[in-house]
Design a protein with these regions (language model features):
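Outer-membrane beta-barrel domain signature
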Residues: 93-94, 106-107, 114, 124-126, ...
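C-terminal motif of bacterial Sec signal peptides marking the signal peptidase cleavage site
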Residues: 24-27
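Short amphipathic beta-strand and strand-loop transition segments with alternating hydrophobic
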Residues: 162-164, 218
């Protein structure tokens, strides 16, 4: 994508950024880092961003100990695998990594100010497509070049967002997860809805030099999954595949981020924390497992603001 901006060329940095993203994003995951502020994109302006983070979830860490990794490696080398507790543990680990993986995350985004209080955008998270909108219900709606009346340093802004992500989920590229998948033939899809309530205080008029933001987040996820192993047996009977199952769960969290820069370019460190009870999940041969945990999402974002030069 080419961006025009007076006196500067962003082509090389953009290409380098895209290449770095491809290297760092090892698996697809719906982005949950909140790097927005309470102020939406001013009408007629664009914002282009890149965000790099890390999803640190306790559920998959709990399910993936050294013994399980060894069991996965051993099972992957066998022509037939005996059904038992180890197979159930492999399934639980696969589910935990799909529901909330431990992995790097990255996304490229673009936003546009549709009207004074509303903007919308698209994110590509390397396998996950994300569409979102944000409505500002508190604070002025001008720009650093044309600040609204009352826009001074310390002004409070507030908004509410709506983000929808869809993806064909896959396990992260880790050797023991590849072993699990070769045994279980695991498949999954998921959709995610995220609603952040964002409050921020401006640094300079209309966030000219940045802002500090914080707030609460509600998220809801819908997951479909199944297992279709070819060589798992109980005695002499082959274990049948698990038909596609559908589950959904809610997440609750909070976040804080710091936007620092000047007018056109900003750096945004952020951290989000979520708690979720994923619920109960059916496994092969009538078994089941339940999962819950906490997720930490530290991130670092970069944002380029493209003003409306027609004003």
């Amino acid at each position: 994508m080419n961006h025009l901006f007076p006196h500067f060329s962003f082509r090389r940095p953009a290409l380098a950024l895209a290449a770095a993203s491809l290297l760092l994003a090892t698996a697809c995951s719906a982005p949950r880092a909140i790097v927005a502020t309470g102020k939406v994109t001013p009408q007629g302006e664009f914002r282009v961003g890149y965000n790099q983070g890390f999803n640190i979830a306790t559920a998959p860490i709990d399910k993936a100990g050294a013994a399980l990794k060894n069991a996965a490696s051993t099972a992957a080398r066998k022509d037939t695998v005996g059904y038992g507790g180890a197979v159930n543990s492999l399934q639980a680990a696969a589910l935990a990594y799909i529901l909330d993986p431990v992995q790097p995350t990255a996304d490229l985004s673009i936003r546009y100010g549709i009207m004074p209080h509303l903007d919308a955008g698209y994110k590509y998270a390397f396998g996950s497509h994300v569409f979102d909108a944000q409505y500002q219900f508190l604070g002025p709606t001008g720009s650093p070049e044309n600040p609204d009346h009352g826009a001074v340093s310390g002004t409070t802004y507030a908004s509410i967002g709506l983000q929808f992500a869809t993806q064909r989920a896959k396990l992260p590229s880790l050797p023991f997860l590849s072993d699990i998948n070769s045994v279980l033939n695991f498949r999954a899809t998921r959709n995610d809805l995220l609603i952040p309530l964002i409050i921020s205080q401006s640094f300079g008029p209309e966030e000219e030099i940045g802002a500090i933001s914080y707030g609460l987040v509600y998220a809801h996820s819908w997951v479909s999954y199944g297992f279709a192993p070819n060589n798992v047996y109980l005695n002499t009977q082959k274990i049948p595949a698990l038909p596609t199952q559908s589950r959904n769960f809610s997440s609750f969290g909070g976040f804080v981020n710091l936007k620092l820069g000047y007018r056109y370019f900003y750096v945004i460190p952020a951290v989000s924390v979520f708690y979720q009870n994923y619920g109960d999940y059916a496994l092969l041969n009538g078994a089941s497992t339940s999962l819950s945990g906490v997720t930490f999402v530290p991130s670092l974002g970069f944002q380029l603001r493209i003003p409306n030069f027609t004003k």
